[in-house]
Every structure is written in structure tokens, then in C-alpha cells.
Amino acid sequence: MYRYIKGIVTQINPQHIVVENNGVGYLVLSPVPYQYKIGEETTVVTYLHVREDIFQLYGFKDEETLNLFLKLISVSGIGPKSAMSIVAFDDTNKIIAAIETSDAKYLTKFPGIGMKSAQQIILDLKGKLVNDELDMQLLSDNSKDVAAALEALGYNKKEIAKSLKHVNFDQDLNKALKEALAILLK
């Protein structure tokens, strides 16, 4: 398996780039190929996907995007093509926040992801993408408001983070706060 390829970008297409290293041109499927420039030396973090009939090299700008991609393809029914469409269109923090807050509607905006797939992603990955510590940058507006209210009531960040993992933020803010409190009072 290749961990990364460092070389000169020699070709850019809508689906891939070609990175030349020591006279060998590697065709690398990229979620956002136009972030690279022809003639620029770059390091592409890679994943080699092996099927019985094909070897495909996927490339990403950073480890964080690669790690999210790998988590997504571990979900039943989500292949590399669907995972690429997810990481191509948005910031990884927004995607992680949507998964952690059970925002299936947000995930359905990506090509090839319907409600059933979005719910499967949430079911398989919720709680596995962030630490137990609360990361305010990853939270949606509703979850930030609930977190602030719980903090004002004297709960620590670890307790808040654990409760927010189980709250449905598609509902009204007051109901979400009540749900978080009910979880904390168990």
C-alpha cells in the first residue's frame, strides 16, 4: 500500500490527477482535483483500493480527509465512489458534525446518498469520529446552544459531550435541551 506520493502534478482531469515521481506517472482519483496546479510539487496522501478486477489509487490533500474517507467506506453500502462524493463537497468538520448530531437530512445532499444510506452512516459512525471531549467547532448551532445551556447549569464538557451524542437535533431547541437533560439525569 502507498501512504503518500510526492511528486509533480502533470495532469488534471475532473475525476483524477496524475502525479509524476521518478519517471512514473501515478493516476490518483481525487475528490477535488482542481485544488492542485499543473507543474506544482505536491504530496498526496493516498489509499489503494483493491478489488478483484481493479486497483484504484485515491488521493487526498491531508490525513484528516483520508481518515474520514476510510471511515465512510467501512459503512455497509458506502463504497469509494459515494465516500468521494461526500468528502469532495464539504469541510470534514461539517460532515463529522452532521454525523455526531444525527443530521441525516444534511448527509442526503451529497450525490448517491439517500436517507437510508445517511441513517446507516450515522448508525455506524456516530461516536467514532470525535473524542469524548466536546469540540465546539464541530457542533451545529442547535447543539452549541444546548451545550452552552448545559454548561451554564454546571455540567462539565465531558458530560455534555456524552449527552449530545444521543440527542436528536432535528427537533425544536427546547425539546433537544430536555432530551439532553434527561440523558444526564439517568
Curated annotation (Swiss-Prot):
Gene3D superfamilies listed in its UniProt record: 5' to 3' exonuclease, C-terminal subdomain, Nucleic acid-binding proteins
GO biological process: DNA recombination; DNA repair
Broad class of the protein's primary localization: cytoplasm
Recorded superkingdom: Bacteria
Region (Domain II): 62-134
Residues covered by region (Domain I): 1-61
Pfam families (alphabetical): HHH_5 (PF14520), RuvA_C (PF07499), RuvA_N (PF01330)
Cellular localization per UniProt: Cytoplasm
Key words, A-Z: Cytoplasm, DNA damage, DNA recombination, DNA repair, DNA-binding
Presence of the UniProt keyword DNA repair in the record: yes
InterPro entries: DNA_helicase_Holl-junc_RuvA_I (IPR013849), Hlx-hairpin-Hlx_DNA-bd_motif (IPR003583), NA-bd_OB-fold (IPR012340), RuvA (IPR000085), RuvA_2-like (IPR010994), RuvA_C (IPR011114), RuvA_C_sf (IPR036267)
Region described as Flexible linker: 134-137
Presence of keyword Mitochondrion: no
CDD domains found in the cross-reference section: UBA_RuvA_C
Annotated segments matching region Domain III: 138-186
GO cellular component terms listed in the entry, alphabetical order: cytoplasm; Holliday junction helicase complex; Holliday junction resolvase complex
GO molecular function terms noted in the UniProt entry: ATP binding; four-way junction DNA binding; four-way junction helicase activity
Listed SUPFAM superfamilies: DNA helicase RuvA subunit, C-terminal domain (SSF46929), Nucleic acid-binding proteins (SSF50249), RuvA domain 2-like (SSF47781)
Domain characteristics, as noted in the entry: Has three domains with a flexible linker between the domains II and III and assumes an 'L' shape. Domain III is highly mobile and contacts RuvB.
Function of the protein: The RuvA-RuvB-RuvC complex processes Holliday junction (HJ) DNA during genetic recombination and DNA repair, while the RuvA-RuvB complex plays an important role in the rescue of blocked DNA replication forks via replication fork reversal (RFR). RuvA specifically binds to HJ cruciform DNA, conferring on it an open structure. The RuvB hexamer acts as an ATP-dependent pump, pulling dsDNA into and through the RuvAB complex. HJ branch migration allows RuvC to scan DNA until it finds its consensus sequence, where it cleaves and resolves the cruciform DNA.
Self-association state and partner proteins as the record states: Homotetramer. Forms an RuvA(8)-RuvB(12)-Holliday junction (HJ) complex. HJ DNA is sandwiched between 2 RuvA tetramers; dsDNA enters through RuvA and exits via RuvB. An RuvB hexamer assembles on each DNA strand where it exits the tetramer. Each RuvB hexamer is contacted by two RuvA subunits (via domain III) on 2 adjacent RuvB subunits; this complex drives branch migration. In the full resolvosome a probable DNA-RuvA(4)-RuvB(12)-RuvC(2) complex forms which resolves the HJ.
Family: Belongs to the RuvA family.
Name of the featured protein: Holliday junction branch migration complex subunit RuvA
Organism: Acholeplasma laidlawii (strain PG-8A)
Encoding gene (name): ruvA
